Amino acid sequence: MVHLTPEEKNAVTTLWGKVNVDEVGGEALGRLLVVYPWTQRFFESFGDLSSPDAVMGNPKVKAHGKKVLGAFSDGLNHLDNLKGTFAQLSELHCDKLHVDPENFKLLGNVLVCVLAHHFGKEFTPQVQAAYQKVVAGVANALAHKYH
């Protein structure tokens, strides 16, 4: 559960309504793979990840980034029940994929950077603070099955 003030919730949902999930999702996942290259080991089936340009232009990275942000969007609609919303994804990433839960925090922080880049002055410190709460809540929910 993420505790947002009404103003924070409004800021998050208003900005999210302007997000191009296809573009931002691919960029966020791509940046994760470039900035934290050890995360690439979970995406060996994606083909060429040999350079930043290869990662950022990889259609499988873009497609999976879109899928990731689709799940994130679903979470924004269920901020009062993030653990329930992400229960199946948590189980998949824990039991089958064996993803280090720290990677969820990294991706959340990368997403915040990408949003700041895309929205500039509109991404005020207050909006960032609200998004930091949300991505921390999502990361915690995704790590739930690890505990």
Curated annotation (Swiss-Prot):
In the record, Phosphothreonine modifications are located at 13
- Gene Ontology cellular-component terms listed: blood microparticle; haptoglobin-hemoglobin complex; hemoglobin complex
Q: Could you tell me which SUPFAM superfamilies the record lists for this protein?
A: Globin-like (SSF46458)
Keywords for this protein: Acetylation, Heme, Iron, Metal-binding, Oxygen transport, Phosphoprotein, S-nitrosylation, Transport
Q: Which InterPro entries match?
A: Globin, Globin-like_sf, Globin/Proto, Hemoglobin_b, Hemoglobin_oxygen_transport
Q: Under the GO molecular function aspect, what terms does this record hold? A: haptoglobin binding; heme binding; hemoglobin alpha binding; metal ion binding; organic acid binding; oxygen binding; oxygen carrier activity; peroxidase activity
Residue positions where Phosphoserine is found in the record: 45
Q: S-nitrosocysteine (modified residue): where?
A: 94
Q: In which tissues is it expressed?
A: Red blood cells.
One BP term from GO: hydrogen peroxide catabolic process
Residues at which heme b binds? 64, 93
Give the sites modified to N6-acetyllysine.
60, 83, 145
Q: Which PROSITE patterns match?
A: GLOBIN
One Pfam family of this protein, by short name? Globin
Residues where N-acetylvaline occurs? Answer: 2
Q: Per the database record, which ranges form the Globin domain?
A: 3-147
Instruction: Indicate the family of this protein.
Output: Belongs to the globin family.
Record function comment: Involved in oxygen transport from the lung to the various peripheral tissues.
UniProt subunit comment = Heterotetramer of two alpha chains and two beta chains.
User: What protein name applies here?
Assistant: Hemoglobin subunit beta
Upper classification of the source organism reads: Eukaryota, Metazoa, Chordata, Craniata, Vertebrata
